[in-house]
Amino acid sequence: MLKNIQCKIKEGYLIFSWKPFRKFRIPTKVKGKLMQVRFVPKSGYYTMEIVYQINAPEITIESKNIVGIDIGIDNFATISNNIGTTPIIINGRIVKSFNQYYNKKKAELQADLKVRHKMDWSKRLQRLTDKRNNKISNFLHNASKTIIDWCVFYGIDTIIIGKNDNWKQESKMSKKVNQNFIQIPHALFIDKLKYKAENKGIKVICTEESYTSGTSFLDSELPIKENYNKGRRIKRGLFKSNTGKLINADLNGAYQIIKKVFPNVFTNGIEGAGSHPIRLNII
């Protein structure tokens, strides 16, 4: 670890006064006050982390413009709101494809290793794992940045995230379970959302999401046990209200997540709430 007396940022470059590193000039977009530079060991290499301090805006106390986020797999993040603008869905199928390819390739390589060398792991497997992890990390960064940029554009002051300790796994157990049973670091995604939101003065609230998937937003139901009926969630990811209206099932859950924390936020009616989300593909 190098303290800020051993390095500095000047004209868009990280410069080192520490003798072994003096020849290096590393371009950076860091704008805040440099605190330290640390080198974190990984599998066969190191990553450099720049720790810096910025003056974050004060987080608002009152919640007026609110979004709710339902986290899943195919629909990685479904974002509802109470301001009447079109909701959005972050497509998660690309992450699913990362894991399917990784699980398949990993199984093939491990099978070959066991037969040929009586081994379970190799440098090639480590490279495959690192590549998968880097792709997912990049996706989480871009997805969280997209959401925060959207919130800033629409003047959102509060984000409510539905949290489930077991996280939904939509894949069905079958002979392809190793390709389809997906492990996505949702907690890391929430952490990225939190610090990006904090830097913009946006409040983040995590709430448990019980009864949000089986209660009806379109029928103005509260997400409580007495209203729970998951039988209204029909095929193709749709939720059917008591009056026969259809809404994206995850979007219904995202609206109900808002009502978990602010049950009266839609007291002026739900007519202005969007029921047809836009799907975004994050690269």
Q: In which residue ranges do the predicted regions lie?
A:
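Positively charged, low-complexity nucleic-acid-binding target-recognition regions
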Residues: 178-283
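Short amphipathic beta-strand/extended segments with alternating polar/hydrophobic composition
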Residues: 17-32, 60-62, 85-93, 247-251
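Short polybasic amphipathic segments
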Residues: 5-7, 11-17, 75-82, 236-242
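Short beta-strand-initiation
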Residues: 2, 32-34, 43, 64-66, ...
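Short, glycine-/Ser/Thr-/acidic-enriched flexible segments
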Residues: 21, 53-55, 74, 84, ...
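Substrate-contacting helices/loops that form the catalytic groove of nucleic-acid
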Residues: 42-190, 267-283
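Acidic carboxylate diad motif detector
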Residues: 1-40, 183
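An anion-binding catalytic pocket shared by soluble metabolic enzymes
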Residues: 31-51, 220
